[in-house]
């Protein structure tokens, strides 16, 4: 649903398009089996999202937030822009309520006046939440908060964000070092002596990329093969065991969030036997249906396919490294 939201909101922010078409709102059983719908083939809700949440970003009136990043450092102000997409030419809006929430607890709120309207879309207006407003919500781990935008008629939208504490940690090709203690990166299980994590070779493996299956993987695979083009990766996003001790200080959602984006850019997926249940795995398409691991335990040794040393200064990479170090030191 996050991919749908991003796609639709990108279109709504553009003054160059007058509308869009979803292909399709329901699962489609022709041209292969396309399980792409928010609804099933009988037009019933599949439980992925409620109708109310769907209409936050797909409706005649949508209040839009635009963020440079959905992750940030604790102690920094939260900055974003707001706009309104309004299809009714007679309807006018006078206020956007911007609220920062920690679960059900309101941390900060302010009102802004919408920008000048040109056609369907208003001009963007900048909003800043000062760092002091969320200080009481901070934890010794990545902290998830929510920005809620509300119009005077009750129209609302929301955006999860993740704030990362400063971490005194060193990430190199050799391993993760903190407080004089090292968790080593090794290339094979037989080298995993003491505090170590195996980083297997990416040779012959799929990259840790994914794209929502907007249609049908077998059809696009066969088209790519017939045209001599690269075959789509065909993976569908992460499934995460949030109870894993290795993720105690990291993001606690059981699906892909922006906290994982930089990490996945350094990773591949490892084909595994079906009896291994990874802490972090990539969901495969229904045709290939392989067990694809990113963080998993095999023969009593933890493996991680992400090469964290490639992005040692990225805050989310450092946060994951900290969580791994805490569990394995």
Locations of the language-model features?
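Beta-strand-rich binding/interaction modules
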Residues: 76-115, 122-129, 141-152
């Amino acid at each position: 649903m996050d991919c749908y939201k991003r796609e639709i909101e990108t279109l709504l922010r553009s003054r160059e398009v007058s509308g869009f078409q979803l292909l399709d709102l329901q699962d489609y059983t022709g041209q292969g089996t396309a399980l792409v719908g928010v609804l099933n083939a009988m037009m019933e809700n599949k439980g992925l999202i409620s109708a109310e949440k769907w209409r936050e970003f797909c409706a005649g009136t949508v209040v839009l937030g635009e963020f440079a990043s959905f992750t940030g450092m604790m102690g920094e102000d939260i900055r974003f822009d707001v706009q309104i997409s309004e299809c009714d030419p007679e309807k006018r809006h006078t206020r956007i309520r911007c609220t920062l929430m920690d679960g059900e607890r309101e941390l900060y709120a302010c009102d802004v006046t919408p920008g000048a309207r040109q056609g369907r879309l208003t001009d963007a207006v900048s909003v800043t939440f000062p760092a002091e407003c969320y200080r009481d919500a901070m934890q010794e781990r990545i902290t998830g908060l929510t920005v809620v935008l509300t119009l005077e008629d009750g129209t609302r939208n929301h955006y999860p964000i993740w704030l990362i504490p400063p971490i005194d940690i060193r990430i190199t090709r050799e391993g993760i070092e903190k407080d004089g203690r090292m968790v080593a990166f090794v290339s094979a299980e037989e080298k995993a002596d003491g505090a170590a994590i195996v980083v297997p070779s990416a040779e012959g493996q799929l990259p840790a990329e994914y794209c929502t299956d907007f249609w049908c993987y077998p059809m696009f695979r066969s088209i790519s093969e017939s045209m001599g083009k690269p075959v789509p990766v065909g993976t569908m996003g992460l499934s995460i065991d949030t109870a894993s001790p290795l993720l105690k200080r990291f993001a606690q959602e059981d699906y892909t969030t922006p906290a994982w984006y930089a990490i996945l850019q350094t990773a591949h997926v490892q084909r595994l036997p079906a009896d291994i249940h990874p802490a972090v795995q990539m969901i495969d398409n229904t045709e290939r249906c392989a067990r694809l691991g990113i963080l998993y335990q095999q023969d009593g040794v933890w493996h991680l396919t992400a090469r964290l040393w490639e992005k040692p200064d990225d805050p989310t990479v450092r946060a994951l490294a900290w969580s791994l170090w805490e569990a394995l030191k």
